[in-house]
Amino acid sequence: MTTKVAIIGLGIMGQRMLTHMRLHHDFEPDYLWDPNKSACHQAIILDPQSKVMDSASDAISKADLVYLACPPAVREPYALAAAAAGKALFLEKPFGINLDDSARLMAGLQAYNVPIAVNFTQASGAALTDLLVAKERGEMGALLGVDVIVTYPAWPRQWQKGADWLRFRPEGGMTREVISHFLFFTERV
């Protein structure tokens, strides 16, 4: 059985996920929506099999799984609508633009019995797997602490330039976009 997927938010991450999901026969990322018509047009060029729906609600109604790649300021209503409709959720982070908004979203989602996952790609990669194996074998010695040092020649990174909201602290910034991966990573270690 294939999983029918709606993608809400067709910027960089939405388009990347569309391309990668299409490679897997267990997923049908056929239902798309974004308020930006240009992003919708780009997504259809990338994947002519999919269809831009008239609204986010239409996309959600057709899917088994809803991937939310929209900016965090607008994510909550889509997430709650999908959960209320009994749809599994795959979320980008951060959940909201501050801790209160994020906590409210999580509390709201807990009222529904739907699977929820967050796209922390580095948490399932070879680097973490290798590190956990080395830790288990005692090859690292005693863990005394963690230093996270992140630098980039430019922010946002070149591949993220289309997501202008990432440049600004209220919704993005390097800490929310990058450091969150490393915090999740180190928490697992």
Protein language model regions, located:
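Beta-loop-alpha module in the N-terminal Rossmann-like domain of NAD(P)-dependent dehydrogenases
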Residues: 17, 47-108
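Short strand-turn motif at the edge of the Rossmann-like AdoMet-binding core
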Residues: 93-94, 120-122, 150
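Predominantly a Rossmann-like dinucleotide-binding segment in NAD(P)-dependent oxidoreductases
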Residues: 125-189
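Short, Asp-centered acidic motifs that coordinate Mg2+ and/or phosphate
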Residues: 31, 65, 145
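N-terminal Rossmann-like dinucleotide-binding module
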Residues: 1-47
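Rossmann-fold dehydrogenase core element
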Residues: 104-122, 144-146
